Amino acid sequence: MGDPERPEAAGLDQDERSSSDTNESEIKSNEEPLLRKSSRRFVIFPIQYPDIWKMYKQAQASFWTAEEVDLSKDLPHWNKLKADEKYFISHILAFFAASDGIVNENLVERFSQEVQVPEARCFYGFQILIENVHSEMYSLLIDTYIRDPKKREFLFNAIETMPYVKKKADWALRWIADRKSTFGERVVAFAAVEGVFFSGSFAAIFWLKKRGLMPGLTFSNELISRDEGLHCDFACLMFQYLVNKPSEERVREIIVDAVKIEQEFLTEALPVGLIGMNCILMKQYIEFVADRLLVELGFSKVFQAENPFDFMENISLEGKTNFFEKRVSEYQRFAVMAETTDNVFTLDADF
């Protein structure tokens, strides 16, 4: 007889429970076109989901690298900032540096394995790539501004060293580990991570741009917020394709939970007052962004909040077409968004 206290014995029960959960999950997956296994997943053409493919091409057209961001003018600005401003910016960067890795963990561990549609897999693959660029960019910014190795190490380990960053990270990580939640619930949760958890921090950095500070930081923020806007739009598109969507009540519960955590983060734990922003208006802005996300998911607003920051008009979640028609800082890869017929090669030109 095996000892019931031994890990192996406990593991069998856990495996059995896990197997039961997996069977239920597989039954639900077969009802979802996005999750249904098919040999079609190995071949991209012919395109079955043109709107999903179009978003993949938008992501591709917007590719950039950390080396393309000029940080040479930032240090003189950084050295003139007040201690509170330096504290706020460095801690925001620490949060961001950790967060992109968590988003990627979800894409690698869950979404890329669950979704069977090749067009969506292409998008997720490219999202993983650009999230790595974001993470590198934030790490490079910390490396550039923070000269003290101990402070730098503290910031790079934000999930362990900063309780308020850990709280946000734990919320996201819990969704990755949750084997009972539906795919739809997790799509909403990670739309909240990229649409709500990032929104206030993006706004804080755009506030610095309004003041004419830190051109390298604010330019990278434009590029990253544009990317995250597309990722959030993509999550909403995937949600629209689901047959078994979570209820409006459940979706609201997930998003309102994220709003509370983000409001606490930027008005209590790391208050935007440190850089001269109004904490009450920041709370309102986070509610405004959450309402926009709910509408894009196909539901009604919860907060009925107006956008209190005029400088964020083109950066809000409404940016689905705005972002890409505006072409932030003219950063779009040439010809990627052109129709295939526009790129025909011929030999009949006169030389």
Swiss-Prot record:
| Any one GO CC term of the record | ribonucleoside-diphosphate reductase complex
Q: What is its main location?
A: cytoplasm
Do you know which CDD domains this protein is assigned to? Answer: RNRR2 (cd01049)
What is catalysed by this protein? Answer: a 2'-deoxyribonucleoside 5'-diphosphate + [thioredoxin]-disulfide + H2O = a ribonucleoside 5'-diphosphate + [thioredoxin]-dithiol
Q: Where in the cell is it found?
A: Cytoplasm; Nucleus
Which residues of this protein are catalytic? 138
> Per UniProt, which keywords does this protein have?
Cytoplasm, Deafness, Deoxyribonucleotide synthesis, Disease variant, DNA damage, DNA repair, Iron, Metal-binding, Neuropathy, Nucleus, Oxidoreductase, Primary mitochondrial disease, Progressive external ophthalmoplegia
Question: How is this protein induced?
Answer: In response to DNA damage in a wild-type p53/TP53-dependent manner.
- Biological processes annotated in GO: 2'-deoxyribonucleotide biosynthetic process; deoxyribonucleoside triphosphate metabolic process; deoxyribonucleotide biosynthetic process; DNA repair; DNA synthesis involved in DNA repair; kidney development; mitochondrial DNA replication; negative regulation of intrinsic apoptotic signaling pathway by p53 class mediator
Q: Where is this region: Disordered?
A: 1-32
What is a GO molecular function of this protein? Answer: identical protein binding
EC number in record: 1.17.4.1
Q: In which tissues is it expressed?
A: Widely expressed at a high level in skeletal muscle and at a weak level in thymus. Expressed in epithelial dysplasias and squamous cell carcinoma.
List positions binding Fe cation 1: 100, 131, 134
Q: Where does Fe cation 2 bind?
A: 131, 194, 228, 231
- Function of this protein? Plays a pivotal role in cell survival by repairing damaged DNA in a p53/TP53-dependent manner. Supplies deoxyribonucleotides for DNA repair in cells arrested at G1 or G2. Contains an iron-tyrosyl free radical center required for catalysis. Forms an active ribonucleotide reductase (RNR) complex with RRM1 which is expressed both in resting and proliferating cells in response to DNA damage.
Known disease link: Mitochondrial DNA depletion syndrome 8A: A disorder due to mitochondrial dysfunction characterized by various combinations of neonatal hypotonia, neurological deterioration, respiratory distress, lactic acidosis, and renal tubulopathy. Mitochondrial DNA depletion syndrome 8B: A disease due to mitochondrial dysfunction and characterized by ophthalmoplegia, ptosis, gastrointestinal dysmotility, cachexia, peripheral neuropathy.
**Could you tell me which PANTHER family the record lists for this protein?**
RIBONUCLEOSIDE-DIPHOSPHATE REDUCTASE SMALL CHAIN, RIBONUCLEOSIDE-DIPHOSPHATE REDUCTASE SUBUNIT M2 B
Record protein name field: Ribonucleoside-diphosphate reductase subunit M2 B
Q: Which organism is it from?
A: Homo sapiens (Human)
